[in-house]
Amino acid sequence: NPYSVPDLYDDMLNTFSPKKNAAFEFCEAEYFLAYKDNKVVGRIAGIINKRANETWNKKEVRFGWIDFLDDIEISRALLDAVAQWGKSKGMDTIQGPLGFTDFDAEGMLIEGFDQLSTMATIYNYPYYPQHMEKLGFEKDADWVEYKIYIPDAIPDKHKRISDLIQRKFNLKVKKYTSGKKIAAEYGQAIFELMNEAYAPLYGFSALSQGQINQYIKMYLPIVDLRMVTLVTDAEDKLVAVGISMPSLSRSEEHTS
């Protein structure tokens, strides 16, 4: 499919490994494959995020990384396997597609099938949500992805408002040229801020210290720092962070 971006296999294997993924501090998982005529025709992961369940006062088993051929019996068997596993663990609801945390790809595409996917989002065929509806699943939330075109120059009005806000609240915009330096000085603060800002988001569970350490080590030394902006207040406390990255979708296509 020309619009689908494949997973990075090493990254996916690390995500599934209790030895490599710090989310297993508060998650457990089980993985299932569906076979037909001795061929793999579907896959699914079952996940119990204990921290999220405690936060939202639920007993949910999550399903994620679901893929299947266009056969309702295959999708039914996969979801039944996760549901039964969750039930054996005391869960009473199944929900997904979700990952271990919000840093994993989530949701199911219901429109925009002719748009190039990204490495951080899920692409699926139109029959996927049709199967969900036939199996009695109901949509619980909408996530919308936007494409924004950036002008060559910042409009004067935007710049004036930015300058005014910075002066009024004594804010400072910080840029770095060293990944190790930004990790050492603000790595912990970046993820603590994310925990605070993301707390109200759908299904969110706060990152543990183990996860924070893992993400600092994984991401901050390699991101393009020209696309990372920090904002601090008068006391040098981090109050905002913006992280962007160039699209790797076309490059990812050549890894499959």
Task: Outline where the language-model segments fall.
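A conserved beta-strand-loop-helix scaffold within acyl/acetyltransferase catalytic domains
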Residues: 1-37, 44-54, 175-252, 256
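A general structural signal for short secondary-structure junctions and capping/turn motifs
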Residues: 22-25, 85-87, 135-138, 163-165, ...
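Extracellular structured ligand-interaction cores
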Residues: 29, 60, 141-143
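Acyl-donor binding region in acyl/amide transferases
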Residues: 55-136, 256
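Active-site/acyl-donor-binding loops of N-acyltransferases
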Residues: 101-152, 219, 226-229, 234, ...
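Acyltransferase donor/substrate-recognition loop-hinge adjacent to the catalytic core
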Residues: 122-202, 227
